[in-house]
Amino acid sequence: MTAEKLVVYNTLTRKKEVFEPIHAPHVGMYVCGPTVYGEGHLGHARSAITFDIVFRYLQHLKYQVRYVRNITDVGHLEHDADEGEDKIAKKAKLEKVEPMEIVQRYTEYYHDALRKLNVLPPSIEPTASGHIPEQIRMVEEILSSGYAYENTGSVYFDVEKFTNDKNKYGHLSGRILEDLISGTRSLDGQHTKKSSADFALWKLASPEHIMKWDSPWGKGFPGWHLECSAMSTKYLGETFDIHGGGMDLMFPHHECEIAQSVAANKKEPAKYWLHNNMITINGQKMGKSLGNFITLNELFTGNHTLLEQAYSPMTIRFFTLQAHYRSTLDFSNDALKAANKAFRKVMNGMKMLNSLEYSTDIVEQDQALNDEINKIIADCYKGMSDDFNTAITIASLFNLIKKINVFYLQQKSTAVLSKETFEHMKTSYTTLVHDVLGLVDEVAVNPEGLIKGLLDLYKEAKENKQYDKVDQIRAYFKQQGLAIKDMKHGIDWAYEE
């Protein structure tokens, strides 16, 4: 536990604020999930891991968190626009299957990838198609407020009227309405809008449109922005604590969510807005047209021309956590290899720590070392409480590993520590690595079974000078990503760094 107050960077106010939940100890958090028309990629992983860390740390601080992360399975049109084809329906036509087959397949892919990345499931995972009545009711509320209009079966949000009534539109993203209007390109179908800045709440479905529902305005489907407003209101109330998502969603998606909630509920939806930054590939924005679009499955298997090897899910997770969530994260093979090495170092720290026992040796306690270890642990939590800065926490963990190594190599007896400091070191390291950062062991073999037996064979082969057998056992360990350590006090294994 930390004595530091949790501070978060609120995109809405552009500053760090002390986190004070509306109804402590309860916390409501809504995060925009994926549109499930293709395999998950690095961008999906970064957002999921970012808010998994937020979820984990809030729980560590004893908050009771209701975490809602949606699945968009209808209404998200190409180019995030109000015209064009539904992304899922388009994929379904290409593959000659039902849209919900596409939804089912890629939702399962997404869940499987997140399980591998050790991302905790949210408390609730609603789908847009499962909440059509709630969305229709919200459109009716916005129409009643005077901030929407219907035109030939479609309903649009009247951004100009909303802004003229002293409401803030563009506040989250820092955009000005006049610039939005002048900078919007003309699209087919925009003649049904009063202004190019207006956005769809409900769209009239063309006869060939697959996914459509009855509504007071005719057969149609909900606007992409409306889905999140309706679902967050249903499960978290009209105002909740945290709304999160990728920085690319800030405009128009999150900006429109705020406007919808203010129009329907007369209040802003979230107290704190958190946005994770983007991932670049060798300094370039990730995109299919650039040939640098990498799915998570390709990362796990190494099956992509840009990849020099496969990278494990924990390597991907650690790579993501090495940077603060608001920083741009640049992918490269070198960066992932370095992350893999660093992750193994953290796991070696865990293994060394688990092998230590508190000594009953009669030695003088080293007060300076006690103080130093306690300060390092405090620094770990200080990093987490400073806007979930995992980069600082990981750097502090490496400082703690250096201290653990001193005891593991028997350069000092654990008796130089107080029993309290020793136990604090063990429990804090385990809690931070496993529970807060969500890093877990990836060794496929059983350390208590096969590894122990092989180490006995290795020791015997060395004593009998059977060096071919020694080399064979070392080679097997290397294949498993492990290394054999010959030390003064005996033979042990570690993760290969």
Swiss-Prot record:
Q: Which cofactor does it need?
A: Zn(2+)
**SMART domains from the entry?**
DALR_2 (SM00840)
Q: Which GO terms describe its cellular component?
A: cytosol
Any single GO molecular-function term of the entry would be: ATP binding
**Key words, A-Z:** Aminoacyl-tRNA synthetase, ATP-binding, Cytoplasm, Ligase, Metal-binding, Nucleotide-binding, Protein biosynthesis, Zinc
Q: Which reaction does it catalyse?
A: tRNA(Cys) + L-cysteine + ATP = L-cysteinyl-tRNA(Cys) + AMP + diphosphate
Family, per entry: Belongs to the class-I aminoacyl-tRNA synthetase family.
Any idea of its EC number? Answer: 6.1.1.16
Its EC top class is ligase
Pfam families in the cross-refs = DALR_2, tRNA-synt_1e
Per the annotation, the residue ranges of the short sequence motif 'KMSKS' region are 285-289
Return the motif ranges for 'HIGH' region: 34-44
Q: Which residues bind ATP?
A: 288
Its subunit composition reads: Monomer.
A single GO BP term for this record reads:
cysteinyl-tRNA aminoacylation
Primary localisation category: cytoplasm
Q: Where in the cell is it found?
A: Cytoplasm
**What PANTHER family would the database entry show?**
CYSTEINE--TRNA LIGASE, CYTOPLASMIC (PTHR10890:SF3), CYSTEINYL-TRNA SYNTHETASE (PTHR10890)
Recorded protein name is Cysteine--tRNA ligase
What does the note accompanying the cofactor annotation read? Answer: Binds 1 zinc ion per subunit.
Q: Where does Zn(2+) bind?
A: 32, 228, 253, 257
